[in-house]
């Protein structure tokens, strides 16, 4: 009996090894075939893109330059007439508030959007119903007073909706209610929304983002602050290796012509270098690893990994969808709500818009039926829609901020790289997010002087440059404290009023 058992065990072992061998062989064959397809797609779309219609490159994530966004908006406005006006009720800027000390920021933003910048889109505030249940009467009065000011901006244009918080029950961090922002994906009464975290300063309206190409359901800037100058240099080499120009001016000129002539632009947009979101240069391997049917033999632990950059979640352009909303509420949230250090940006980049998975889905659709794949995501330029205040004081991030279409340079007609000062970068940015760890948010301070940037000559390597950066940084915070006057009872500056309640 023992001899038979040993024979059986040997037989089972041989079968197991044979199955593993077959699995590995099939995988190698699949990867080889897919790698050939990827190479073909790259060459095909590089050479044939001008004549294509309704067929889109599935192996790239596309970036859209600011000039192209403006060109699309200009083209849209040229079609507007008295007989065919834009229905602005289909578009909205959206904030959410779960804490009293953030409510004033929504008032500041909405006041600027209506009174200063003149947007006609709806402005919607999702406010936690917990804010109306405080046992402190003065806090309740404070909330109601600020809400009254918000409504008085324009009772028709402003929409205030009470919501229930989505809370991580065992999390005591400042972000334990950040998942609440995901409710914005369910605002299906709008055709497109611009979601904005309100711990930021607005320098202009962003109406142009409502009119991105119609198939785009999600667009956002990238987390550029995770990159180094070395990473940036690598992206230039990668683009050139793919026989593409790194001169952004060449792309924007061609895109402008196509928009003027009513032609599709997706295949002509600059691609996001794949080294920024793939874990290796074997594109086929990454695609196969990202499929739901990937074998655990092949690095299954990497399925949820994201690359060097991912989507920021402080500014998002969204086409609300009941299907996406249901997926978030019923599938994604239960998986993440009890996980440590997993918040809104993690859910968006691991569950919804993991760039590796996006490319895998695109290729899968394209291989089944070319016309089945329609691009649905875009990368927005962070140099216009999302820098951090902390980056202003970090000279090593300035080069990245100047070239916000990653892998490409702003080069003039003479072939010279266009140099932008940090003042120009900040001036041209529409949305600047307060992020200066270990400093707190500006409303945590009673006056600007408490957080004013000052240069220490003893420790500075370049006093003049550091002072310039400080001056730019200070100008943003000074502007915030000035704008915060709108929240005070008697319209006098009381920057810490919300905290005092």
Curated annotation (Swiss-Prot):
Transmembrane segments: 12-32
One example GO MF annotation: acetylglucosaminyltransferase activity
Subcellular location: Golgi apparatus membrane; Vacuole membrane
Alphabetical GO biological process terms: protein N-linked glycosylation
Highest rank taxon of the organism: Eukaryota
Keywords assigned: Glycoprotein, Golgi apparatus, Membrane, Signal-anchor, Transferase, Transmembrane, Transmembrane helix, Vacuole
Motif interval(s): DXD: 197-199
The protein's enzyme class: transferase
Location, primary (coarse class): Golgi
Enzyme Commission code(s) on record: 2.4.1.-
Stretches assigned to the Lumenal side: 33-501
Residue positions with a glycan: 176
Protein's job: N-acetylglucosaminyltransferase involved in the Golgi-specific modification of N-linked glycans.
Matching PANTHER family: GLYCOGENIN SUBFAMILY MEMBER
Protein name: Glucose N-acetyltransferase 1
Originating species: Candida glabrata (strain ATCC 2001 / BCRC 20586 / JCM 3761 / NBRC 0622 / NRRL Y-65 / CBS 138) (Yeast)
